[in-house]
Amino acid sequence: MFVENLKETINLGSKFAKQLNPQSIVLLKGPIGAGKTTFVQGIAKGLSITEDITSPTFSLSHHYRSGEIPLIHLDLYRLENVSSAREIFFSEEEEAIQRQAILIIEWPELIEPFIQNFWKINIGYAKNYGRHYEIRDPKNLLTFS
């Protein structure tokens, strides 16, 4: 699916949020600046979260509790080894289970082999401008492209 601008990215994220349930896991992949956090802002909008959504690159995770379903936003970009990434992921996953939250993970490459039953979103730069989104459901079926 082609997305031309920030507004369309927010709208796509908001629509996508309606597919999610408590304890859904979403893996977000894409290069730096592709719009991963903007897409998460759209998901938060779709969940009626009123807090400002910012990138958790330096803090590793942000927790949002004001919406219909709580949201945990994890960013593993700064982590360099699998054991650290796994430790943080499993801790945040436990929190998501306890709070019935959705867990969204940016830069999930180190932990993807250890996770089952997740949504996978690949964001890429389109040829001249905009972004291309490929969204796969937990059964690995293409839902948007």
Predicted regions and their residues:
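N-terminal pre-Walker A segment at the start of P-loop NTPase domains
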Residues: 1-15
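Phosphate-binding P-loop
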Residues: 17-23
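Hydrophobic anchor at the beta1->P-loop junction of P-loop NTPases
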Residues: 26-28
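The conserved Walker
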Residues: 32
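Conserved lysine of the Walker
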Residues: 36
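Short beta-strand-centered segment that lines the nucleotide-binding/catalytic pocket of NTP-utilizing
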Residues: 49-64
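Short phosphate-coordinating micro-motif centered on Lys-Gly-acidic
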Residues: 83, 91-145
